[in-house]
Regions:
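Non-catalytic, usually N-terminal nucleic-acid engagement modules in DNA/RNA processing proteins
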Residues: 1-184
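Glycine-rich phosphate/ribose-binding loops and adjacent secondary-structure elements
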Residues: 165-168, 177, 181, 189-278
């Protein structure tokens, strides 16, 4: 059980790269767009068409929505998300952090984690770094994302700095839990840290340097395309690129219009997702 990214080509005129990410469910050739299957299936299209017509090599499922419905008992009883969804290729789960923090009127942020109410029935729940890693282990995707706070794009610097500090403390707890637990379904699961920092280049650079201590299989850039101008988003990608390991896959979360993908690839990004097409 393992995961390995192999860099195969670099564009001499830009930061663009081509490579392959080997997972236990198949090889992903990058750069690549990842369709969003919120509840582990891309809406309105058969898996065979996602694979053969859309030529998707990996899909994203959402931890928050799977936790809410159908719930972890059903996912685990099915033998993990691959058997539950019948998608045979690689899968990634986000941590649910973006969805939880989108419930601004229904959540309370604390050091321990985030208390929130279900958007379905109003029931109370708590996501902590530990519980999210446990949930993602139960889901069983090839790539798990660390639990982080996703502040708004126009967050004041003081708030952005405090948010980043909290995300970094949570990241320590995520990796502690990750190393304390094992995959449930016989295949390797990677945990990717997320670089935050809002629209402040120095905070972004600090975050990109900090995450390298974990020796992760890949690294993500989060908290963009959340209200900031497009050019500012591109500036933030450029700000973190020099600090991102060259031999690991780079994932730009929640960004995936055709123009955004081209600009992201030019700046050294390998993996993209966006809910708009699905």
């Amino acid at each position: 059980m393992s995961m390995k990214f192999t860099l195969q080509h670099k564009d001499p005129a830009s930061k663009a790269r081509a490579g392959e990410l080997a997972t236990d469910h198949g090889v992903i050739r990058t750069p690549i767009f990842m369709p969003v299957g919120t509840a582990a299936t891309v809406k309105g299209i058969f898996h065979r068409d996602v694979r053969d017509e859309a030529r998707a090599q990996i899909i994203l499922a959402n931890t928050y929505h799977l936790y809410m419905r159908p719930g972890m008992e059903i996912i685990e009883k099915a033998g993990g998300v691959h058997r539950f969804s019948t998608w045979e290729g690689p899968m990634l789960t986000d941590s649910g952090g973006f969805q939880v923090f989108s419930l601004a009127a229904c959540r309370k942020l604390r050091e321990e984690g985030c208390h929130f109410r279900s958007h379905i029935d109003g029931s109370k729940h708590l996501f902590t770094p530990e519980s999210v890693v446990d949930t993602e282990r139960t889901i069983g995707a090839d790539i798990m994302m660390a639990f982080d706070e996703c502040p708004p794009g126009d967050a004041p610097r003081e708030y952005a700095a405090k948010s980043l500090a909290l995300t970094e403390r949570w990241l320590d707890r995520c990796f502690d839990r990750y190393h304390q637990t094992e995959p449930k379904y016989g295949h390797y699961q990677a945990l990717f840290p997320i670089v935050q920092g809002c629209t402040y280049p120095d905070l972004r650079a600090h975050a990109a340097e900090n995450v390298q201590q974990y020796g992760a299989d890949g690294y993500a850039i989060g908290g963009l395309a959340v209200g900031e101008p497009t050019e500012v988003m591109y500036e933030m990608i450029s700000a973190v690129e020099p600090y991102m390991p060259k031999d690991k896959i780079r994932y730009l979360m929640g960004v995936g219009t055709p123009g955004n993908i081209l600009e992201g690839v030019r700046r050294g990004v390998d993996l993209f997702d966006c809910v708009m097409p699905s």
